[in-house]
Amino acid sequence: MCVFFCVCIFLCVYFFVCIFLCVFFCVCIFLCVFFCVYFFVCVFFCVCFFVCVFFVCVYAFAHVAVCSVRPRRHVCACSRAYLHHRNGSGVYKKVIRPAGRSAHPPVGRFYTRPLFSLSRATCGPSSGTSAPRPRWRSLTLGGAHGPRGRSLFPPASPRLSLCGSAFCLSFSLARAIVFSLSPGSGARLHLRL
């Protein structure tokens, strides 16, 4: 009788130990899978972030190269508008371009606004206001349709959405970051922009 009782106790302990080991093993597997998935998700997001930064930098460098060859492109005008708006105060300003083959076309006077009002300066005043819509003046010697072609800044159009202004802001900010990280950025920033 005593032997039977001891065998029962041993079997019960053995059963509970087996259950405990199985549960512990399952928990370990779950934790390993969870940490592996978490690690791969973190790596994936880090790779996506660096890839996005890389393509933004490449796009900014390509934009600089394209603007050096064809400075009258709309995106170039858009980014330069942001850079002039950043230091603008709502008045007409005179910008002097450097002479040379790679310089931008001679520019005249144009409307500037602070950074926070770029979308309004681009798209005109919001509905319900009586403020006059700012008009872009010609940035080429030939006027809007002169010998040098169309001007860099066309008249403001209400069809331009806020997304266009946001694109200009983000794109120009990326260009500014690229210029600030490159050697000799101070001189080139004034020459190219």
UniProtKB/Swiss-Prot annotation:
Topology relative to the membrane: Multi-pass membrane protein
Alphabetic keyword roster: Host membrane, Membrane, Transmembrane, Transmembrane helix
Lineage: Viruses, Duplodnaviria, Heunggongvirae, Peploviricota, Herviviricetes
Entry keyword annotation includes Transmembrane: yes
Transmembrane segments: 15-35, 36-56, 160-180
Name this protein carries in UniProt: Protein B4
Subcellular location: Host membrane
Highest taxon above the source species: Viruses
GO cellular component, one term: host cell membrane
Main location: host cell
